[in-house]
């Protein structure tokens, strides 16, 4: 049920905070990281029919993020952490979900973006030992995705060549050869089916610079798990807002609010005023 809305998740996290059995309640993230994770979940709901931002929905988004942030002490990660944004590094797509804190029992809740189907396998493998469950986080009843395009663009007027390029880009071979969740259905099914095969892969790691080593054994996915993942991916309908100017404004102002540097009303007014002015200029 916590995955049905940000408020339900915040309620659940505050309840879990009463049990002090783990170092943190939520996977440690900087304010910017929390704001971006939930921006990707909720921003699709903000734009009204007239093209302006809905102040009430922006206010609720900020309120729920701050509730989650305030549950834990973030002084360590804020002092040395770097803002980790879902994106590209050396040509490789990565997400913001880190299943290792649950595996090492240093937190009770983790969330973030899934970059490829192998992230599902890691998440399921990490949750095997403690019975953790996962769900698609949505707000307003519709789950969202973070669109990503990796392509070469050439100027010119060759329409046939352009069509052939797009066809190749969206084809099974291109989807299978790159990191990320492919839009090609055949490529996606092949990637999921591959994770049902036998695997003996393991990964050793430590946390927070300690000498203690952990080893996680990757396990094969079951048919039921594979079917569930495919159904979840196929059910995604809307993308998060993709305009970087809007995203940057929200994250910048939201960080000041989450850290207690300005109040909610000031933050909402600053975001809606600047974003609505920007949107009006784009029309």
Region annotations inferred by a language model:
Residues 5-53, 57-59, 105:
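Extracytoplasmic/periplasmic solute-binding protein
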Residues 11-15, 80-111, 115, 252, ...:
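Short helices/loops that flank or line small-molecule/ion binding pockets
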Residues 103, 112-129:
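A ligand-binding cleft/hinge motif common to bilobed small-molecule-binding domains
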Residues 123-194:
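Extracytoplasmic/periplasmic substrate-recognition and gating elements
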Residues 203-283:
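Conserved C-terminal helix/tail region of periplasmic/extracytoplasmic solute-binding proteins
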Residues 17-29, 174-185, 277-283:
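Bilobed periplasmic-binding protein-like "clamshell/Venus-flytrap" ligand-binding domains
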Residues 10-17, 36, 62-69, 162-171, ...:
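Non-transmembrane alpha-helical segments in soluble domains
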Residues 13, 48-93:
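Glycine-centered hinge/linker elements that transmit conformational signals in sensory
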């Amino acid at each position: 049920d916590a995955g049905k809305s940000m408020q339900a998740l915040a309620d659940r996290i505050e309840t879990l905070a009463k049990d002090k059995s783990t170092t943190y309640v939520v996977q440690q993230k900087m304010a910017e990281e929390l704001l971006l994770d939930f921006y990707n979940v909720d921003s699709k709901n903000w734009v009204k029919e007239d093209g302006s931002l809905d102040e009430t929905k922006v206010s609720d988004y900020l309120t729920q993020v701050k509730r989650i942030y305030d549950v834990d002490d973030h002084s360590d990660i804020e002092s040395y952490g770097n803002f980790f944004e879902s994106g590209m590094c050396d040509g490789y797509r990565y997400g913001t979900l880190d299943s290792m804190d649950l595996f090492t029992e240093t937190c009770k809740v983790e969330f973030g973006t899934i970059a490829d189907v192998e992230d599902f396998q890691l998440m399921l493998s990490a949750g095997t030992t403690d019975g953790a469950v996962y769900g698609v986080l949505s707000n307003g009843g519709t789950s969202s995705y973070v669109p990503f395009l990796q392509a070469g663009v050439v100027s010119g007027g060759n329409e046939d060549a352009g069509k052939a390029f797009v066809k190749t880009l969206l084809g099974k071979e291109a989807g299978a050869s790159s990191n990320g969740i492919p839009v090609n259905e055949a490529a996606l099914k092949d990637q999921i089916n591959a994770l049902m095969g036998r695997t003996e892969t393991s990964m050793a790691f430590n946390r927070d610079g300690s000498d203690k080593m952990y080893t996680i054994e990757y396990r094969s996915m079951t048919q039921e798990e594979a079917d569930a993942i495919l159904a979840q991916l196929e059910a995604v309908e809307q993308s998060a807002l993709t305009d970087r100017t809007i995203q940057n404004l929200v994250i910048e102002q939201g960080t000041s609010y989450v850290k207690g540097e300005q109040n909610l009303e000031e933050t909402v007014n600053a975001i809606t005023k600047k974003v609505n002015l920007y949107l009006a200029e784009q029309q």
